Every structure is written in C-alpha cells, then in structure tokens.
Regions:
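Mature catalytic core of soluble alpha/beta enzymes
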Residues: 1-195
Length: 195
C-alpha cells in the first residue's frame, strides 16, 4: 500500500519502511571523498559498509582491498585500486534469512517482488569518474538481480569490471576484472571469463 503523489510517497501501513541505505552508501562515498579532498587530504581509503573508494595511494603503493568470500571466512580475492576508483559488492551472505534450509537474500527482485536468487555475490569495480562511488553501489544491485543475464546489463550500464559467484558457487569474471584480481589461494576451478 504505497501511494506516490508527485515527489511524495505515503502509506497507511505503519509497519511499511523504505530503506535507501543500499544506494546511499555509494553517494556517501562520493561525498566523503569530496570533503576529504576539500580539506587537503589526498590519500585515503573510505569504507562505508563494504563499499570502498580510494584517494591517492598508501605510502606510494596502490590501495589493496579484499573481496569477501560469500560462503567462507575471509577474502576470496584482492584487488588494487587506483586514485578515484570504487568497489561495490552485493551479496546474500550478510543480510539474509533462511526457511527450510534455503537462503533468501535481502535484495528484492522488482520483477517478482521476491528475494533475488541465483547469485551469492557480485562485485563491481568502477574506474575513476564523477560519481564513481554512487555507480559502484547502484550498479552492483541490478547486476546481482540480473543473475546469469548480468553481462548484457553490465554492457548497457558501461560497467566493465565484474566478478560474480552464482548460486551454485561457480565464478564468472569479466575479462577486464580478471586482469585486476589477485586470488587469495589459486583461481577457482569453476572460473569462467566473460568477454
């Protein structure tokens, strides 16, 4: 029961809440890095709930961040970030619920109104550009929801760097992202490179 009137949304359901946190973290990244730059800070790593954006370098070296494994403790890979780049991940492993042993993501598929399925985790890297933080956050969700159709959507969104773990634990990586990843152990045997 959500009513939209112009730019205003309302409901009679007292329990209804709309949470924009999933997209506003990326906007907050852009805002935080702008404030840091305005204050003369040229080197920083900003992490807002798993969304990361970097400025400059770490003691002359690129910033290196880990990409969390969706089913095991610790990172599955690391990636070096250059000045102004941002990383965003959507997954079913931090906010979820289980019913009869089946995991349901907190990310809803707007086509069905049900939790998105078929993807355990999806990470995007956005190269330095205006609103890189917002795009890293905003792009990871629809690509997560798109499931196996993510390559077509990534092309339409102009997102070149993508890593996806599907619902069965198979890894898919865009060619551009493959060149940026360093696997913690060895590359997984079920890795598919998507052109």
């Amino acid at each position: 029961d959500l009513r939209l009137t112009g730019l205003q949304a309302s409901s009679r359901q007292r329990a209804l809440a709309i949470d924009f946190g999933g997209y506003l973290k990326g906007v907050a990244l852009d805002r935080a890095t702008s404030i840091l730059l305005a204050q003369g800070v040229g080197n920083a790593l900003v992490n807002i709930g798993g969304n990361v954006m970097v400025l400059g370098s770490r003691n002359g070296q690129r910033w290196r961040v880990g990409i969390q494994h969706p089913r095991q403790p610790g990172p599955m890979a690391t990636i070096e970030l250059e000045d102004g780049e941002a990383v965003g991940t959507s997954g079913d492993y931090q906010r979820y619920f289980e019913v009869d042993g089946r995991r349901y993501s907190h990310v809803l598929d707007p086509r069905s109104g049900r939790p998105a399925s078929g993807t355990q985790a999806l990470t995007v890297l956005i190269t330095a550009r205006p609103a890189a933080g917002a795009l890293s956050d905003a792009a990871s969700k629809p690509l997560f929801i798109a499931g196996s159709e993510w390559p077509d959507l990534a092309r339409r969104l102009h997102v070149q760097h993508v890593l996806r773990i599907d619902g069965d634990g198979h890894w898919q990586v865009s060619k551009a992202m493959q060149g940026r990843l360093e696997f913690v152990a060895r590359p997984p045997p079920s890795l598919t490179v998507v052109p």
